Amino acid sequence: MSRLRRFNRKILSLSSDYTHDGESDQEDVSILPLDTEEQEELIQKFETNAHITNKLYINLLSILYLLYGGLLMILVRKSRGYIKLALLAGANSLICSCITLRYDIVNDYLLFKKFKLRVSNFSINIINIILLVLMAWISFNHVVEDKKTVLCLQVPMFLFWVAVLVKRWARNIEDEIADLRCLKYKYKNA
């Protein structure tokens, strides 16, 4: 068990005193392989560490989405015409980005007991892209009128791509941990 703790400390800490090139002291990781229980403990540690980190990033991004969405709603009250429509599209785009970032959605809804409406992250992303295109089209057509607002309207596009990248990054980490579980070997210490 102490060997596992030393191994975990070496891997998980970002200390600069990690020894390389044959330098050894008593705290170095043993060259003996980890047994199956130690492997499972280490993989579970990686999994919980990744889950906590993902949750932190998603919560921080959600707060950022809510704050910027509130700012856009304040700007909606002060603006007129087409810019108001673009700001509303930007606020709705932020809502869609936040929903797809936080949740994995696959729901079926019955409309008027005849039509079946399937709502998933893919369909929310399609709506989000339509809103972003509408917002960009309006903002670039009226760039002469209000340049500050046009710059504010570029942030929802950036935050959409951030949400997509964070979601993909979280899925990649989950896949890597699943691959790590498949690579476990059978070894028992005496």
Curated annotation (Swiss-Prot):
It is found in: Membrane. GO terms for cellular component: endoplasmic reticulum; membrane. Residues 1-55, 102-123, 171-190 are cytoplasmic. Coiled coil: none annotated. The chain crosses the membrane at residues 56-76, 81-101, 124-144, 150-170. It comes from the Eukaryota. Present with 238 molecules/cell in log phase SD medium. It is a multi-pass membrane protein. The keyword Glycoprotein does not apply. This is Uncharacterized membrane protein YGR016W. Residues 77-80, 145-149 are extracellular. Keywords: Membrane, Transmembrane, Transmembrane helix. It comes from Saccharomyces cerevisiae (strain ATCC 204508 / S288c). The lineage of its organism: Eukaryota, Fungi, Dikarya, Ascomycota, Saccharomycotina. The keyword Membrane applies.
